[in-house]
Amino acid sequence: MSKINLNKYKNVKRRIGKDWINLNPIQRGGVLPPESRETLQSFGDGYSTCDYCLEGRVDLVDSPPIDDLAGDIAKFVNMDEIMFTAGCRHAQWVALKALTEPGDVIVIDSLAHYTTYLAAENLDLEIREVPHNGYPDFELEVEDYADIIEEVEEKKGETPAVLFLTHVDYRYGNRINPEKVGKIAKKWKIPYFVNAAYTGGIMPIDGRRWKSDFIGFSGHKSWASSGPIGMLATSYEHSEKTFPKSEVKGPWSGRGFTKKIPQLFGCPPVFGAPIATLMSSFPHVYERVQNWDEHLENARWFVDKLEKIEDFRQIGQRPRKHTLMSI
């Protein structure tokens, strides 16, 4: 057996003190409350939630109430169904897999997360970008979605397969009105995906009002859970096609796995700490969202004070519409 220096892997700890405050804007939403740190200890073993699995999928476990959690989160964001995924990036891929064929065109905002681009690349899709106006605001004109749809239809003879909106981007924290894009999607009868990785769990979400067919969420970014974990919200209209059950059958053994979902690798890959902490943190997240207006005012106050320091300037939307910001 090869000799390996194992000492560097022992007693690995995060190099921050307990009295430190994490100000990283893309990490604040994923900070665990005290009760979830206890849950993390209890469910830290890899397959710990599988102790309770009788149905072959972690999302169907009823004690602890994982099945209830999916239903309650769906109500919380005003959508029909929630499925747990291996992060928002996985949620994007699952939805695009259901909605597209190789060579299809999708329209995305030019502030989209890199995982949106990679999901499209993985599925051999063509991308059209809605431009922004550059420094210092980096804002988009929602009406440009309609212009690009018309351009695609003229060139391809058909409309894009999906409209994709990043509710708040991770670089500048700009917030785009999802309802306005939703109206464009409905007018053209195009499926509509909202990436709410940095807003779900932070501020109020209303999928029906937005007219969204899909919403992607990130548990470890914005729902105070360990990771990786995400969620894909959808409507009953798209549910069956998005989460089809396995039909494979062993030609010799006859084995089948009829409760498994191929796009989720059989079972949502969130067993153990990710799903347990998401569940434990839900009351904390629910309360946090109720206080969104206060959090937003605090962010605006913070920007005002920082910009009184010489050479400090906030870039992106003014006034702030999200607590995530770039200075």
Q: Where do the protein language model's features map onto the residues?
A:
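Conserved active-site segment immediately N-terminal to the catalytic lysine
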Residues: D206-H220
